[in-house]
């Protein structure tokens, strides 16, 4: 059986790419997959823009759609879809770094993704 990959939450700061931590950058660059929230209207989001110059051409970029709505049904469906997309890589042993603008420990998109992963995939 393949060892599961690791899901990392990477705080990428407030917009200046030089504010990412050295450790965060190291993990980001060694991960096979880099996930990030899609921006409004499907455009590049802030987190993607911050990390773009640090990514290698061979890394898989995984944009995840988290709608800007308050409808719990719509949000739950989006979290489930995102968790399923990330799981496809983790179960084959790939590490996934989730780039998140700001601080992942404070009201972060990453926390919702991690909670959904745990509920959908207990082995996670």
List each model region and its residues.
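Class I S-adenosyl-L-methionine
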Residues: 1-17, 22-24, 29-124
């Amino acid at each position: 059986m393949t060892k599961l990959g690791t899901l990392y939450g990477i705080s990428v700061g407030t917009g200046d790419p030089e504010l990412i931590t050295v450790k965060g950058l190291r993990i980001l660059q060694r991960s096979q997959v880099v996930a990030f929230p899609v921006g409004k209207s499907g455009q590049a989001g802030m987190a993607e823009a911050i990390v773009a110059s640090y990514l290698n051409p061979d890394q898989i970029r995984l944009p995840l759609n988290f709608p800007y709505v308050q409808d719990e049904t719509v949000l739950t469906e989006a979290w489930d879809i995102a968790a399923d997309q990330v799981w496809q890589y983790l179960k084959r042993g790939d590490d996934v770094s989730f780039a998140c603008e700001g601080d992942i420990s404070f009201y972060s998109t990453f926390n919702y993704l991690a909670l959904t992963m745990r509920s959908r995939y207990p082995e996670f």
